[in-house]
């Protein structure tokens, strides 16, 4: 009886780990970056986020409540996906490298958000395909004024056994975010939920346990 019980426990644990890994690979984690000058991480010279294939990068644009600030003071940005050389100089070569435009700081539905999925294959002809072990580079240019201020981000796609590069931002929470602990004035926080399907492992555990108990 004890041997059967131990086997049942091992089976449940093994299946649970397998289901968790499958959900992790299928759903991916979300990494949130607040793209505004108040984000202190952009003050680092090598601000880097580590992701894995099937993860998501959520870019949250600057947002202000209507009437909270003067229109000429709000931040607007054009974001580019560029090569390393352009990342270093912060000068994109072509308008074809434009990835997104954060140009609706007073959007009625809340802050604009853009999503990048780091997938190996894409069904779109002009889509970007990402590879493990490589680093991808994002930079922005301000729309709200003509200046040389540059905000830039490195995203490293690591494999299962690939060690992260130096100075990589890897928070412990499942929802990876650079949201500051102290609320910023005039900036609305974004709300994100767990990307994994809720309750699936627990439900499977229960069914397996019930079936095994019926056999005892």
UniProtKB/Swiss-Prot annotation:
Signal peptide position in this chain?
Answer: 1-28
CDD domains cross-referenced by the UniProt entry: Ephrin-A_Ectodomain
- Glycosylation sites recorded in the entry for this protein: 36
Q: Which PROSITE patterns match?
A: EPHRIN_RBD_1, EPHRIN_RBD_2
Q: Which GO terms describe its molecular function?
A: ephrin receptor binding
Region (Disordered) spans which residues?
A: 162-181
Annotated coiled-coil segments of the chain: none
Q: Which residues form the propeptide?
A: 196-216
Report the domain of life of the source organism.
Answer: Eukaryota
Q: Where is the Ephrin RBD domain?
A: 29-161
Q: Name one GO cellular component term.
A: side of membrane
Keywords, in A-Z order: Disulfide bond, Glycoprotein, GPI-anchor, Lipoprotein, Membrane, Signal
An example GO BP is: axon guidance
- Lipid-modified residues of type GPI-anchor amidated serine are 195
**The UniProt record lists the keyword Glycoprotein:** yes
Q: List the disulfide bonds.
A: 61-102
Task: Fetch the InterPro entries from UniProt.
Answer: Cupredoxin (IPR008972), Ephrin (IPR031328), Ephrin-A_Ecto (IPR034252), Ephrin_CS (IPR019765), Ephrin_RBD (IPR001799)
Question: Briefly, what is this protein's role?
Answer: Cell surface GPI-bound ligand for Eph receptors, a family of receptor tyrosine kinases which are crucial for migration, repulsion and adhesion during neuronal, vascular and epithelial development. Binds promiscuously Eph receptors residing on adjacent cells, leading to contact-dependent bidirectional signaling into neighboring cells.
Record's subunit section: Binds to the receptor tyrosine kinases EPHA2, EPHA4, EPHA5, EPHA6 and EPHA7. Also binds with low affinity to EPHA1.
Name the protein family. Belongs to the ephrin family.
Annotated protein name in UniProt: Ephrin-A1
Origin species: Xenopus laevis (African clawed frog)
């Amino acid at each position: 009886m004890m041997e059967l019980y131990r086997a049942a426990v091992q089976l449940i644990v093994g299946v649970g780990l397998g289901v968790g890994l499958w959900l992790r690979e299928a759903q991916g984690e979300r990494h949130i970056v607040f793209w505004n000058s108040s984000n202190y991480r952009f003050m680092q010279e090598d601000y880097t986020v580590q992701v894995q294939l099937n993860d998501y990068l959520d870019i949250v644009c600057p947002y202000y409540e209507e009437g909270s600030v003067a229109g000429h003071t709000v931040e607007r940005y054009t974001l580019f996906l560029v090569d390393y050389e352009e990342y270093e100089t912060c000068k994109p070569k072509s308008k074809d490298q434009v990835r997104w435009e954060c140009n609706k700081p007073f959007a009625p539905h809340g802050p604009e958000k853009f999503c990048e999925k780091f997938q190996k294959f894409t069904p779109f002809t002009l889509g970007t395909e990402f590879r493990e072990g490589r680093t991808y580079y994002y930079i922005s240019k301000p729309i709200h004024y003509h200046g040389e201020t540059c905000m830039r981000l490195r995203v490293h796609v690591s494999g299962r056994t690939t060690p992260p590069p130096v100075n990589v931002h890897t928070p412990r929470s499942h929802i990876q975010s650079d949201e500051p602990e102290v609320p910023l004035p005039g900036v609305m926080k974004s709300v994100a939920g767990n990307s994994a399907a809720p309750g699936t492992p627990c439900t499977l555990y229960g069914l397996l346990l019930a079936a095994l108990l019926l056999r005892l």
